């Protein structure tokens, strides 16, 4: 079989990077995935000799490539770029590192979130820590690491850093189930700065907590585009059924919507599902002629199918549970008729079965 990606000598890659007179060939990008130690060392030797904007462009191109090919890993080059003297390079490097959130990296991000000299790098590091809160809630990282990350984020939200960094910290703790999270979100939502309100809505969506439904619904049609956008996204993440008709109504003015808002409405509908959603999205798909919009809508329809299947499975599980409970009641009644003795709720066999169900 012919290899669709022939191995290009890494010296050729480095020469191309250093050649400012020519655009960097996009077909070379994949060579930065899983760098061998020798190649990593060679890249490190010339890294700061590469023009700054070229380094930034390279990392951003690698970031874009990850969206279409998730098998690739750019750990080595992003690790190198974390120590770059240019803040913009470090910012993109943090985002690249966060694509593969190893538990050992949490401490690196915590350190950068606190000590990096640039506000945007700190903000990127704080945002990356949100993934560790999410993983911790799923028991995918150790409780010790989770608590360290949560404590660091709470310290930053309540600290003296810039509003941007503190807002990103609030968004990251949106995943957190600790009781300290709720008052922080409430305080941010009451802030006079709409940036804080937007971050509060973002955190509400991540929490998936129905307590915030009123606040989210109240901002779906906000005159502030940022607040409306975040409320639309939060409605989808929280699967707020009451938002379905209002989001469908928004799609009736598809061409008038901002591109980002349009995308948020479509995706949130795919997360909420329900009557009329599939028909609306499929009808919209037939009207589109832009390839990117078509691809996005097709992905939304795939997600809608997942949503529908999940809800259908939940209905079957509920029906199975109800039938099982009914069978248990019938069996108990038969037992009473056969034994002519009332069953005690203190019966050892019943209690044991109940404990197994709870486990």
Describe these PLM feature segments.
Residues 1-70, 324-359:
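N-terminal alpha-helical scaffold/docking segments in eukaryotic complex subunits
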Residues 2-12, 35-47, 68-83, 102-115, ...:
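Amphipathic alpha-helical scaffolding segments comprising HEAT/armadillo-like alpha-solenoid repeats
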Residues 21, 50-51, 85-86, 117-118, ...:
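Short inter-helical turns and helix N-cap capping residues of alpha-solenoid HEAT/ARM repeat scaffolds
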Residues 15-35, 45-48, 56-69, 80, ...:
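Structural detector for internal amphipathic alpha-helices that build alpha-solenoid repeat scaffolds
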Residues 84, 153-155, 196-197, 293:
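Short, mixed-charge aromatic SLiMs
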Residues 282-359:
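Eukaryotic acidic, Ser/Thr-rich intrinsically disordered low-complexity regions
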Residues 90, 94, 112, 117, ...:
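A broadly tuned "polar low-complexity/structure-edge" signature
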């Amino acid at each position: 079989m012919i290899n669709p990606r022939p191995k290009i000598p890494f010296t050729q890659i480095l020469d191309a990077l250093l050649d400012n007179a020519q655009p960097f060939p996009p077909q070379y990008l994949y060579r930065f995935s899983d760098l061998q130690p020798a190649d990593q060392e060679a890249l490190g030797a010339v890294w700061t000799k590469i023009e700054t904007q070229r380094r930034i462009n390279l990392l951003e191109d690698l970031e874009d490539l990850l969206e279409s090919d998730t098998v690739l890993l750019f750990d080595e080059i992003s690790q190198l770029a974390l120590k770059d003297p240019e803040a913009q390079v470090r910012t993109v490097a943090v985002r690249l590192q966060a694509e593969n959130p190893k538990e050992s990296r949490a401490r690196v991000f915590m350190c950068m979130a606190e000590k990096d000299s640039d506000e945007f790098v700190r903000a990127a590091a704080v945002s990356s820590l949100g993934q560790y809160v999410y993983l911790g809630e799923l028991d995918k990282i150790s409780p010790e690491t989770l608590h360290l990350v949560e404590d660091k984020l709470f310290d930053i939200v309540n600290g003296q850093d810039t509003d941007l960094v503190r807002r990103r910290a609030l968004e990251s703790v949106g995943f957190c189930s600790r009781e300290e999270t709720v008052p922080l979100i409430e305080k941010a939502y009451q802030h006079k700065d709409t940036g804080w309100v937007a971050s509060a809505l973002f955190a509400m969506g991540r929490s998936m907590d129905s307590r915030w439904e009123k606040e989210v619904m109240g901002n779906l049609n906000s005159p502030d585009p940022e607040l409306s956008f975040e409320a639309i996204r939060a409605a989808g993440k929280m699967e707020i059924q009451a938002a379905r008709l209002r989001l469908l109504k928004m799609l009736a003015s598809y061409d008038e919507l901002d591109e980002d808002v349009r995308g948020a409405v479509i995706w949130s509908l795919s997360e909420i599902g329900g009557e009329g959603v599939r028909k609306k999205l499929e009808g919209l798909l037939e009207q589109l002629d832009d390839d990117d919009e078509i691809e996005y809508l097709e992905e939304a329809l795939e997600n809608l199918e997942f949503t529908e299947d999940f809800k259908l499975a939940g209905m079957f599980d509920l029906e199975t549970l109800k039938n099982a409970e009914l069978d248990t009641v019938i069996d108990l009644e038969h037992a009473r008729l056969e034994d002519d003795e009332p069953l005690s709720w203190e019966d050892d066999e019943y209690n044991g079965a109940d404990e197994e169900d709870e486990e």
